[in-house]
Amino acid sequence: RDLVRSRGLGDVYKRQGQSYEIKGVRHAIDSGLALIPEDRRREGLVLMHSVEENLIVPIFDKLKRGLLLENKKVADIAERSISDMAIKTHSRKTPAFNLSGGNQQKIVVGKWLNSAPSVLLLDEPTAGVDVGSKREIIDKVRDFVGENRAAIFISSDILELISACDRFIVFYDGKVTATYNRSEITEEVLQYAIQNEC
């Protein structure tokens, strides 16, 4: 995605405080970054492929022995992800296009969690998703952060941000205009900040 390739978005810092340049998608994955894109159907999934195939995309190379996939490992990872993410599907072999929007998004989140990232970037991760799936996805993100990892959550849904985030950074016209901790935030405060009124 352009987010990975762009050079004008600022520096990325590892925990040791050293900045580094993202050189491509594979380098980003190997560096512990994962992106949940806004458009899951165009950028997050290969719709004609199975649930299983989608779930292993980021770790495909790690599941090969020579030129062949280790089918038992693939099946185990897919079944575990389907269970962990509560993906409703008849089979791990079901094409992704047959699933509901909420279950498709769970595949996208699940496949990137399979890559064991240290930083998860989520761009409107619950757009067009049913209420139950929204809650499940947000819970998974909070579990991820609870493992001493980081998530950057981008959303136009203020209530969703409040339920999902511990720290809030508001950008306006390309600049940071406000930052808040969870204890400081309310819907009204965040709404005013977004409108550049505080």
Provide a role label for each language-model segment.
Residues 134-147:
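Helical segment within the ABC ATPase nucleotide-binding domain
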Residues 1-13:
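Single conserved hydrophobic/aromatic residue that forms the stacking wall/gate
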Residues 167, 179:
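Short, glycine/charged-rich "phosphate-handling" switch motifs in NTP-dependent
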